[in-house]
Amino acid sequence: MASVNIHCPRCQSAQVYRHGQNPKGHDRFRCRDCHRVFQLTYTYEARKPGIKELITEMAFNGAGVRDTARTLKIGINTVIRTLKNSRQSE
């Protein structure tokens, strides 16, 4: 089995241990020095290009907040926040 050197993204310490898995099955790690929990493969879906436009388009087409969040694989609060901010910017 191959060994991979993992460093904490906050303090760059090599004193890291496995700290379980996230709901998608990706490994989580914890730093022994700063106690930060992090993942190596984390993607923030709401930051991808075009997500804000899709949220507003789905809202205009009558999709609910929960349906939009489930379809786009983002949080319900992200959908609500995006709709509020888009309405204020008009």
Curated annotation (Swiss-Prot):
Function: Absolutely required for transposition of IS1.
Keywords: DNA recombination, Transposable element, Transposition
Protein name per the record: Insertion element iso-IS1N protein InsA
GO biological process: DNA transposition
PANTHER family in UniProt: INSERTION ELEMENT IS1 1 PROTEIN INSA-RELATED
InterPro entries: InsA_HTH_dom, InsA_N_dom_Znf, IS1_transposase_InsA
Family of the protein in this entry: Belongs to the IS1 elements InsA family.
